[in-house]
Amino acid sequence: MAQEIDEVKALLTEKTIVKIANREFVVGKIGNVRCVVAFSKWGKGAATITATLLIQEFAVTDLIFIGTAGALADGLKVGDIVISKRLVQHDLDARPIISRFELPLLNRIYVNSDPELTELAGKAVSNLLERGVEHMVGEEAVKDFNLAPTLYFGDIASGDQFINSDAKRNEILKLLPDVLCVEMEGAAVAQVCLEFNVPFTVIRTISDTADHNARVDFGKFIVEVANAYSRAIIGEIVRLV
């Protein structure tokens, strides 16, 4: 959601707004690092356009995709953070021409995140969790959402579907058992970065359990938790650069 990056945009100084293709790109600096912040919009197609514009129009050298996701793996809980190792499109199926989930003409199912950028993101999140989640979101939000976040690294699946049933969750896990969480954009952005040879990583805050219990107050969670997580994580990444 657009609100997920409001606080990240607030970090920028020397801001300039550029509008292209019904998208708003906020150009500026976080600390001494030149940055461009944009809302990807929902779904793989929209995110592909946004990522391509970031690379082609703004010449970004690294791309960090941050937002929320639904948990698939057992044990993940609301407020946990997942950083990608690999990304896969769970709704991609061009059989019998190629294998299920395979990216056409790329001869691969998974796209790997950049190891150095992923390590940097992990260090940033670890630093923040060591200081305590209440420093990111405040004590009231910690109580309201029962936050006790854990950091995970692993596979993230993307598709043009909101997963909110046990049947769909179990179907994805049966075919892709290593996937930790599911969302709607990351793997498409990963493909763009792969083809343009731009290092990337994906950081996701778990907002729901992607099953029949997925009906949560997203607006409240986005404003009080995800937005604050994003600001803190991006700010800490920049501090570590």
Language-model segments: residues:
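His/Asp/Glu-rich mid-to-C-terminal helical/loop segments that flank catalytic regions of hydrolases
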Residues: A210-V241
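Mid-sequence, gly/pro-rich, charge-dense loop/helix-turn segments that line enzyme active sites
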Residues: L72-L176
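Structural motif
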Residues: D62-I64
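A C-terminal functional module that forms or caps the active site or interfaces directly
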Residues: G159-R215
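Active-site-proximal beta-strand elements of phosphoester/diester hydrolases
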Residues: C35-S40, F153-A157, I203
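Short glycine-/acidic-enriched loop or helix-start segments at secondary-structure transitions
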Residues: E7-A10, D74-G75, L92-D93, H212
